[in-house]
Structure formats: structure tokens, C-alpha cells
């Protein structure tokens, strides 16, 4: 009876030891996961939104650049002239719109009334003259050509009278709503052109959008530039990201926010610290830059690791050894 019991106990002990060993192995695998990556290369091509002659550049390759720093200047003269012209156009349009809103002065109405009286008198005279010419033509005293001349004079006087009457009516009732709306639209168009001219002048200066190091100075002062052509290339130094790749079996270990240890060849005993900031939702074939041979034919997921204690020793493109810690700051 004792022998079967001993056998059963031995089997239980072996199973427990096996399970414990497997769990220990898995924990060591998790703690020992190592990836290889590089400090992400992040550059910004800077250009002027408008074209023109490059007047000056204030930086050279290798210079440290601060956000908001003046980097370059185009010749401002053409844009200053355009701004002056736009301001003048706004003044003209504003004056015209104000006139439309104000209507006509009493003096203008009085002048229009006088013009109507004068045109009416001229029309009455031409009508009476035409009537007399008709009687003379019937008695064969004048020719048909004389009668036609009298009719033309009468019709011209009638048209002049109607024009004067229409003008007087307009002066008395004010400008039509359509004319006022047109004047307002002209003013708004001029104001928009002024705003564009101000923006164009502002954009003749090139301002650093971020801290960084100047990598490339593509042109020199005196060059004629088209809008959008690259002038300077800036290497963005903050924040520092490390790009690495992980295979699917280990993907569960790469959770956003997980703390990571980062080693460089120059300081193998003093790691940088980082956190996983992004895990790609889609797999891709391993890029050629990955140094681990057994991953080069696999589908992997890209990781972005944010370095939390970066310094100037971390240069873009530098190879990095990525080691996952156990969550307590230990490798």
C-alpha cells in the first residue's frame, strides 16, 4: 500500500516542479525581451509660403535653433507695395459704400428738380415746333426732311426728359438695395484682399516652428525662390523617439505606457528610460534596418518609444538596444 502512495506523491512533485519551472521560464522570457531599434530621424523642411528674392539667412548648418527664432527674410518691398495698394482699394470701396448708405444730399435733389424743369421746357418747345411743322408739311410749305428733323428733335428732348425724371426719382427715393449690396460686396472683397496682402507680407519672414538643429542650408541670399521651395532643413531634437519592431508572439508585452530601458553602445551600463507611446495597429515586413537576423523575414509591429530622460548624446539614427523591464525599474 505504501508503494503506490509514494509513486503518486512523486508524480505530483514532478508535475509541480514542471509547472513551476515553466512559469519561471516564462517570467524570465518576459523580463529578458530585447529589441533593437534606432533613434527616430525627424526632420522638417522649411520654406516661405510666398516667393521672392532671398534677402538674408540668420543661421548656418549645425546651429542650434529655438522655437520662434527668425531664420530668414525675403525682400519685402513688393509685398509692402501690394499692401499699400490694398489699403487704398479699401478706402475707395468704403467711401463708395458710405455714399450708397447716406443717399443723396438736398442740393443734389434740387439740382435734379431743376434739370427736370429744363428738360420739360425743352420737350414742350420741341413738341410745339413739331406740331407746327406738321401743319406746314400738310400745306406743302416744308419738305418731308424738315418734318423728320422736327420729329427727331422732339424724340431726343423726350428721352432727355425721361432720363432727368428717372434721376430725380432715384435721388428722392435713395439708392436701390441692389446697388447698396453691390457696394458692400465690393468693400468686403477689398478687405479680403487687404488681409491677404498683410498675410503675404508677414510670410516674407521664416520663423522656426520648433527647437532643433539646422541640418541643411539649401540656398543662399540673393536667390530667387518660388513659394514652397525648401530653404532650410531642421532636425527636431525634442521629444526624442526610438523606433523599434516587435514580432507577434511578444506583442502582448508592448503595451502603451510600459516602461522601457534603452541602451547605446557608448554607455552600455547607464541606460536611458522610456515609455511605449505608440504600437502600430498593422503588421509590416521587417525593415532592412532591423539588426536582429531572426526577425528579418517576419511580420512585425512598429513601436514608438518616448525617451523620458533624453540628452544631447542621443543623436538621430543612433542604434539602440531596447530592453523590457519588469515594471519595477529592474531589467
From Swiss-Prot:
UniProt keyword list: Coiled coil, Periplasm, Signal
Organism domain of life: Bacteria
Keyword Transferase found: no
Where would you find this protein in the cell? Periplasm
Q: Which residues form a coiled coil?
A: 107-208
A Gene Ontology CC term for this entry? Answer: periplasmic space
Q: Does the keyword Signal apply?
A: yes
The residues that cross the membrane are none
Give the signal peptide, or none.
Answer: 1-16
**Of which family is this protein a member?**
Belongs to the UPF0194 family.
Q: Which HAMAP family match?
A: UPF0194 (MF_01304)
Q: What is this protein called?
A: UPF0194 membrane protein Ent638_1286
Q: Which organism is it from?
A: Enterobacter sp. (strain 638)
